[in-house]
């Protein structure tokens, strides 16, 4: 199995986990509170700078003047808190790697170590003087974080090793149709009969009789519309449906594309990602509830994101993917 084939898979899954794991405040959960070695400030700042600069590239530096959804927390504090949670997840995955992966010591081979060193050197050589001042990291710090990140990636693929990644066309099919929507069944039946006439123009009938301003629809297998109108998936290109009743409305469809290949492939990847994300979130939630890692180092309260234009680096993951994104396999 290829490790980390989806180049942003780990980042995506960790964001999902950070977003969906419930707070344990006020809830008694049997667990083992792990006393582990926390990341140093310099090690953490590698990830802080990455996310800070990605936000500023997308939203501009004024983003830090805003507040989060509750209207009270500065967005700056909110993002720093999420980086902390993110790294707590990475540390939890590393704990799993060291305690649960059989022969884990053989995973990080001399070849892997050599590649990670290349990644670390390329990253630190890419940093500007401003980046170095803000992050204040050494080559050893970077090497440590890339090694931890590698192990976290490995655990994700290990957890998903038995997942079936094959999604059939029938599960992900996307079609396109034109529609006519009417409230009167008899009139709808008459329109359907008229559409059978040679040369009948569906667009003309839609303009004349449809009560909906929407004529063209995209219907994805598994979405709300596919549940309402499963008959639409039985149509061939150019074929008309019978009159379909739903919620006191009467629908006539004409299939314009019985298999939208591009959208179907996109849908397939979306479903695959959702299945893998759900499977890993379940795996992680069970393990993390029994092995709670919470960073307590006070430096997290001191980190600032605003007023640091000197740092621009955003290539931590890009460099990792350059070396490992398509190549590694589970041992």
Describe the predicted segments one by one.
Residues 25-137:
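N-terminal targeting/tethering segments
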Residues 55, 87-101, 120, 127, ...:
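Sec/Tat-exported extracytoplasmic proteins
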Residues 191-229, 257, 261-263:
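Peptidyl-prolyl cis-trans isomerase
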Residues 103-108, 202-206, 241-244:
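Surface-exposed patches in mature extracellular/periplasmic domains of secreted proteins
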Residues 18, 26-29, 34-35, 131-183, ...:
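PPIase-associated folding chaperone regions across multiple families
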Residues 44, 49, 180-187, 211, ...:
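Solvent-exposed coil/turn segments that connect beta secondary-structure elements
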Residues 42, 46-49, 81, 85, ...:
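Solvent-exposed, polar/charged alpha-helical surfaces in well-ordered, non-transmembrane soluble domains
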Residues 4-27:
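Sec-dependent N-terminal signal peptides of Gram-positive bacterial secreted proteins and lipoproteins
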